[in-house]
C-alpha cells in the first residue's frame, strides 16, 4: 500500500482544507450479504482515487487487509479509507468504510454504522435481497443511516441466467421493490417515504464491480443506453468500453455525493437518536450543527491493536476539532488521556494529520483505555451523557476451549485474547480462576475460526482448540414462592421471589428505551405506558442487566440500613444471574423481587461477604422453584432452491428439528424461510448441498432464544452439568437455603 501513502500525502493539504467544510464531506460505507461484492466494489472506488492500478482493481481486495481475508476472499473486519473526489467542479472528501457481510461479523457492521451517514447497499443481481441484506439495512435504519442501492453482478444475469433485456429489467425492478419493502418496514416514520430508492432519481445504480462499470437510470437516459446495449456489450465483447464510458467509481461516488447527506445535515436528525443530552445546551447545538469550533465530542467505533503504537481508537468527531496533544476525557471510564497522535486511514495505512474537525473520521493514539462504543469529550464536559450504547444484533452462542501446548505460554495467550476482545466486543472471554481453562465464545464457528487464526498469527504459539460447544441460557416459566437468604453469619435475612420478565420489557431493554442509568421517573413512565408495570414497582428498579436481560426490583418499605447494603445486593444479583443453578449458564429474562429484609445495625456484620451469598442463594432457590428451563439459540435460515428439491431440503430440516416458517415459489426458484437450533446446525451445510445437488443458496443468522423441548431437556441439563464437572442431578432449592 506504499503507493497509497504517497498519493495521500500529495493530497493531504487538499484533504485538510475540505475537512473543514462539512458540506463537502460524506461519511459512507458498504453494506451487504456475504459474497455480494462489497469489497470488489470498494476496490473500484480506490481505483477512482488513484490508489489502485486499474488492472488489479476488481480482484485486488485492497480493503481486505488482514491476510486471512484475502485468503478466504471475504471481509471479516471493517476497513476505513478517506477518498478525494471532484464532482461538479468542487472537491469532496468521502470517508469510506468497507464492512463484512458474513453473519458472524455483524458486530463489525454495528460499530461502523455509528460513524456513517449513508450506506451503499450492494445486492447480487442473481441472489437478490437476502437475510443479511435485511439485517444490515435494518441496522443502518436503526442508526438513522440512509441507504442507497447498488445492484451488482449484472454480468451473471447475462452470462449465467441468459436473461433477455426485458427479463433483466424485471429482475432489477423486483430487487428495488424488495429493497424498498425493507425501508418501509424498518425506517424511522419520518423517513419511510423519503428514503425509498427511486431509480429515476439516480438513487439506484447497477453494474458489475468485477468488470468495473456502473450506471444509473438518468445516466443511461442521457447517453441513450438501453438494456439491450448492455447485453450486446457482453455478447460482442466490448465490456471494456462500457467501463471506460461509465466507470463504476464515478457512478457510485456521484450517487453518494448526491444522495448521502453531509454531516452537518445528517447530525440534525441523528443526534436526537444517538444522544440523550439537552439539545438546547451549548454542546447540544454544536452536535446538531457538526460545529468544528464547538467542544470536542468523539464517538469511538472501533479499537485496534498496533504492534508498535499500542491500541488505536477510531471514531467520528461529532463536534469540535481534535488535535495532537489534546487532553480528552473518556466518559464512563472516568479518566483523562492525552492524544499522542491523530491520523486518517488509508486501508491498513495510517496517515498522520495535525488535527481533524467535526464531521470526519479520525484515528487516535494515546487513548488506550477507550473501547468501541465509548464517548470521548473535552475534559470540561465530563458530566454530559455519553452516546447511546451500541446494540449488537447477534450474540456469542458458540464456545471453544483454548489450551496452550506449553503451559509457560499461558500468560501471553491470555494477554493476546484480551486484546482480541477489545477489538471485537462480540467475542466473549472467560477464564476459570480455579482450573485456568480459557473459554472463548463467538457469534458462530467462522467467527471463532478467524479469532483463533489471528491469535496464532499474533502470538506464534501452539495451542489446541476444542470442538465448538453451544452456549445456552437459563430462565423460569412461572413465579416462585418467596425464599429467605441468610448471610453466613446469620445476622442478615433477605427475602426474594423471581418470575419471568415479560417480552415487552425485554425488548425495551434491548432497544435501550430503558437503561440502568436513566432518570428513574422517566423509566417508570415508559414501563407503565408500554409494558403495563405497576407504578411503585417500576420506581423500585435497582439494576438492569442489559446483556442477558434481567432486572432486580425493591418492593420493601421502611427497612433500616437497606440503603447501605443496596450495592452488595445488586452484586449478588449479578453473581447469581451470570451462571444459573441448572447448569451454570447465564440467566435470561429474569425478574428478581426483594420483598423484605432484616439488616444488622453494625456495618462490620453486613459487608459484601455476608450480603452477596445471601442474595445469590435466595435467588437460586427461587429459580429452582419456578419451573426452570434451558433456552437454546435458534438460527433463521433463508433458502433459495430449485423447486424440484423442496421435498429433499424440507426433510433435511425436519431431521434437525428445523421448522419451515414461510415458502413462496417463482418459476425458477423456491424461497424458504426456516428456523433451526444452533445445536443442529454444524453438519447442515453439507446435507443441504447434497439434498439439492448443489442447486441451493442459503444464509443463516441468529434469530432468537427458545425453550428447549421437554423431551430432551433433562438429558441436556445432565450433559451440561457433566461437562462442567458438576454433580449430574439437578440441585434442589434446599441445597441453597433452609426450608422456609
Curated annotation (Swiss-Prot):
Keywords: Cytoplasm, Elongation factor, GTP-binding, Nucleotide-binding, Protein biosynthesis. The modification Diphthamide is found at residue 605. It is found in: Cytoplasm. The keyword Disulfide bond does not apply. One of its GO terms (cellular component) is cytosol. Residues 23-264 form the tr-type G domain. GO terms for molecular function: GTP binding; GTPase activity; translation elongation factor activity. The keyword Protein biosynthesis applies. SUPFAM superfamilies: EF-G C-terminal domain-like, P-loop containing nucleoside triphosphate hydrolases, Ribosomal protein S5 domain 2-like, Translation proteins. InterPro entries: EFG_II, EFG_III/V, EFG_V-like, EFTu-like_2, P-loop_NTPase, Ribosomal_Su5_D2-typ_SF, Ribsml_uS5_D2-typ_fold_subgr, Small_GTP-bd. SMART domains: EFG_C, EFG_IV. GTP binds at residues 32-39, 98-102, 152-155. Belongs to the TRAFAC class translation factor GTPase superfamily. Classic translation factor GTPase family. EF-G/EF-2 subfamily. Catalyzes the GTP-dependent ribosomal translocation step during translation elongation. During this step, the ribosome changes from the pre-translocational (PRE) to the post-translocational (POST) state as the newly formed A-site-bound peptidyl-tRNA and P-site-bound deacylated tRNA move to the P and E sites, respectively. Catalyzes the coordinated movement of the two tRNA molecules, the mRNA and conformational changes in the ribosome. NCBIfam families: aEF-2 (TIGR00490), small_GTP (TIGR00231). This is Elongation factor 2. It comes from Pyrobaculum neutrophilum (strain DSM 2338 / JCM 9278 / NBRC 100436 / V24Sta). The gene is fusA.
